[in-house]
C-alpha cells in the first residue's frame, strides 16, 4: 500500500513537472512578443494604488522593454545585463550586477518569457500549479537579502502567454501587472 501511495505521488509530481516543462517549452518558442500592460502598485502609505500603463516588448533571448505611456512617459530597456531608464530628458544606465536585489525581479519575467526553467531555479524556489491552459508559477527568492524585501513573485498565464505578474513584498506592498494583447 505504501509503495502504491509513493508511486502515485511520484506520478503526480512527474505530471506537474511535465506540464511545467511543456509551458516552458512553449514560452521558449516565442522569439518576439508585444503586449499592453496595466500596473497597479499598492503601497501601505497610500490609500489608492499607483496606476501606470503602457507596452511591454520582448525579443529573445534577453531584450525586454517596458514603455510606460500613462501617467508619464518612461522607458525601461533591458539588453542583456544592461538596464537603461529613460525619464523625460534624463537617461540612467546600470548593470544588473550592480544591484543584486533588482536582478531577480527583472530575471523572473525575462527568464519566464524565455522559457528558461534552469535560470529561474538558480534564483527562485519554483512552484508550478495548474494546467497547460491555465497555469501559475510561484517564485520564492533563494537569496536571503532578496527574500527580506520580497516574499514571492507570482506569474500566471495560459499556454505561451503570460497574463499577470504579481510581486509581493514582505512589508505588505505589492505590484500587480496585468498583460493583454495589443
Give residue spans per PLM region.
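Cleavable N-terminal signal peptides
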Residues: 2-3, 13
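N-terminal leader/targeting segments and the immediate start of mature chains
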Residues: 8-38, 42-49
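Short hydrophobic/aromatic-rich beta-strand segments that constitute the beta-sheet cores
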Residues: 37, 64-68, 83-85, 137-139, ...
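Amphipathic hydrophobic-ligand
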Residues: 48-54, 152, 173
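Extended lipid/amphipathic-ligand handling interfaces
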Residues: 54-57, 155-157
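An acidic-aromatic
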Residues: 55-107, 175
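Flexible, surface-exposed loop/linker segments and immediately adjacent secondary-structure boundaries
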Residues: 89, 93-136
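Gly/Pro-enriched, hydrophobic low-complexity segments
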Residues: 117-123, 130-182
